[in-house]
């Protein structure tokens, strides 16, 4: 606890101001990048919603949440400034890549895996979607952030090529 207090005392307004780039006077939401978050399921709605909200808080101009209807309905109440892209579901999980190619091509970054799994495991069709998104990010050189079940999926793969800028 003492170390945390010392670090907190070292964080000043000037330090924080210098970390984040200055916003352009004539900038608009399109100026500051577009994050696409692909995740969420019937059981884990919050993870993808919080990741989407965090991307806006950290400075992204636009954020599209690509998920199943149940997740998008909840997200629209909590954060109406998000953009929404509905995906088909089977047994509460994402099962389709529906035009994700266009969304990913236009993205500045993709977040994949937050809450995307099922009640006990990741369904096969969801795994296919994850694999497809990773492949598209690699093809178009889009930075990829893997989280939660995205990492769980990755741990089961032997020969998967990740995009160069993957976290």
Predicted regions and their residues:
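Substrate-binding N-lobe of the ribokinase-like
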Residues: 28-92
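Glycine-rich phosphate/dinucleotide-binding loop and adjoining beta-alpha-beta core of small-molecule
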Residues: 4-5, 11-13, 66-167
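YjeF_N-associated NAD(P)HX repair module
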Residues: 1-38, 42, 153
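Residue-level detector of functional hotspots within protein domains
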Residues: 16, 21-23, 49-51, 70, ...
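Short N-terminal helix-initiation segments at or just after the protein's N-terminus
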Residues: 24-26, 53, 106-107
């Amino acid at each position: 606890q003492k170390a945390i207090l010392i670090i907190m005392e070292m964080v000043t307004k000037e330090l924080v101001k210098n970390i984040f780039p200055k916003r352009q006077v004539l900038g608009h939401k399109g100026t500051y990048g577009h994050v696409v978050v692909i995740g969420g399921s019937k059981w884990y709605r919050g993870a993808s919603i919080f990741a989407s909200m965090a991307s806006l808080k950290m400075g992204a101009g636009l954020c599209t949440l690509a998920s199943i209807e149940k997740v998008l309905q909840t997200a629209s109440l909590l954060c109406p400034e998000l953009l929404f892209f509905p995906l088909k579901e089977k047994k509460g999980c994402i099962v389709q890549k529906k035009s994700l190619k266009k969304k990913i091509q236009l993205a500045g970054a993709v977040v994949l895996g937050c809450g995307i799994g099922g009640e006990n495991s990741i369904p096969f069709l969801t795994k296919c979607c994850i694999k497809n998104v990773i492949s598209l990010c690699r093809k178009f050189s889009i930075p990829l952030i893997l989280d939660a079940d995205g990492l769980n999926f990755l741990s089961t793969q032997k020969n998967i090529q990740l995009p160069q800028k993957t976290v």
